[in-house]
Amino acid sequence: MNNNNFDMEKFKKLAAIVSEGEIDEMLDETTVGAASTLPCAEVVVTVTGIIVKATTGFDWCPTGACTHSCRF
């Protein structure tokens, strides 16, 4: 398998595109773990049987993107 080739069709089957507003509605400050004091905290929430995974910093970032450019 060549890891340099990104297969968008496979990605679409594995991932869901969610707007920032939808994430804000699902995960607000009342959600356990959403207000972590860690600079980057991984939060996993199950919504109707689907696991939604995101990385938090000062704002929502894609999982694994807890970087300087994502946090600020």
Swiss-Prot record:
Q: How is it modified after translation?
A: Contains LL-lanthionine and DL-beta-methyllanthionine, when coepressed in E.coli with the flavecin synthetase FlvM2.
Which location does the Swiss-Prot or TrEMBL entry give for the cross-link Lanthionine (Ser-Cys)?
36-40
Q: What is this protein's record name?
A: Lantibiotic Flvbeta.g
**Purpose:** Lanthionine-containing peptide antibiotic (lantibiotic) that is probably weakly active on Gram-positive bacteria, since its analog [Del1]Flvbeta.g shows weak antibacterial activity against M.luteus. This activity is synergistically enhanced by [Del2]Flvalpha.a, an analog of Flvalpha.a, which is encoded by the same operon than Flvbeta.g. The bactericidal activity of lantibiotics is based on depolarization of energized bacterial cytoplasmic membranes, initiated by the formation of aqueous transmembrane pores.
Q: Any idea which UniProt keywords this protein has? A: Antibiotic, Antimicrobial, Bacteriocin, Lantibiotic, Secreted, Thioether bond
Q: Which gene encodes it?
A: FlvA2.g
Q: Which residues form the propeptide?
A: 1-34
Q: What positions are modified (2,3-didehydrobutyrine)?
A: 37, 46, 48
Q: Where in the cell is it found?
A: Secreted
**GO biological process terms held by the UniProt record:** defense response to bacterium; killing of cells of another organism
List, in alphabetical order, the Gene Ontology terms for molecular function in this entry. signaling receptor binding
Coiled coil located at which positions? none
Q: Where is this cross-link: Beta-methyllanthionine (Thr-Cys)?
A: 55-61, 63-66, 67-70
Q: Quick one: where is this thing mainly located? A: secreted
Q: Name one GO cellular component term.
A: extracellular region
